[in-house]
């Protein structure tokens, strides 16, 4: 079966080896905001597009991947 692993913002960050603090430094998004996005995806869904775009660029993923769709493009090595 070819199931894709669905990743959260926290998982993308961990996959890249970034702490919340490091991602904050890279994006200009406060660490508290990143914590809130990781804690409750509703907060992320209510974020400004420009904020989500900064996170996506830093994580080297498409903006759509930040919103966790099963059909989102994932790196091949995490597809199962």
Regions found by a protein language model. Give the residues of each.
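Short, charged recognition helix plus adjacent turn
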Residues: 57, 65-80
